[in-house]
Design a protein with these regions (language model features):
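Transmembrane alpha-helices and adjacent helix-loop boundaries
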Residues: 1-213
């Protein structure tokens, strides 16, 4: 039983990480589409994101499982990966776009005034501020990603929640479920917070060096 539970916890952890990383990349690309100067690209990005974000994750998984894949027991991990990644990405796009809008135009102009290129301005001025402004919501999205992996059991994925359902002592199963999800969520919060702080410190150091020059 312990091995079964640990195996389920491993599947949940794996799904959470790979889905969240993939969703972040898709979200960044879609956000870039939102910010594009090309009206066609901007419209496509907004329409696509508007459709995906309105589909519940459970419905999306069933869509991939029963219509696209043809068999809900065939490639269940792959189905869960694709469906959950797209759903989380649609939500992250709004988070990233909000972070971009939070950067003051005056700071961008100041960076260009001291001789920074567009790439330097983005990586050393805009990106750190975007990260700093979205970290709290980004952490919440990581926790949400972890929580919705539980719907993957519908298509046959033996994730953490489905393995604890088999425990005869219902109270013990609930406690183990809470402990497992809390562990993954806490670890994710720690990593994301540390990454945000490191980027903020690097940005301040770069600006100080630029001012000295």
């Amino acid at each position: 039983m312990i091995i079964k539970i640990l195996s389920g916890l491993g599947v949940t952890f794996f799904l959470t990480i790979v889905c969240f990383v993939t969703a972040s990349l898709i979200g960044i690309v879609t956000c870039a589409g939102f910010c594009s100067g090309n009206k066609v690209i901007r419209t496509i990005a907004k329409v696509y994101n508007g459709i995906i974000i309105k589909i519940p994750p459970l419905v999306m998984l069933m869509l991939f499982a029963l219509i696209i894949m043809g068999d809900r027991n065939n490639g269940s991990i792959l189905i869960a990966y694709i469906g959950l990644s797209l759903f989380v990405a649609a939500n992250l796009t709004g988070v990233f776009f909000g972070g971009v809008c939070a950067v003051a135009d005056g700071e961008i102009e100041a960076a260009r005034t001291i001789g920074m290129s567009k790439m330097q301005t983005f990586f050393h001025i805009m990106l750190p501020q975007i990260i700093e402004s979205i970290v709290p919501v980004y952490m919440s999205m990581f926790v949400m990603c972890m929580q919705i992996t539980s719907v993957a059991s519908v298509i046959g994925v033996k994730e953490f929640l489905s393995t604890t359902d088999g425990i005869s002592n219902a109270a013990l199963g609930i406690v183990l479920s809470i402990a497992g999800y809390f562990l993954i969520g806490t670890l994710g919060d720690f990593v994301i917070t540390r990454m945000g702080k490191r980027k903020h410190i690097k940005s301040k150091d770069y600006l100080e060096k630029s001012e000295v020059r």
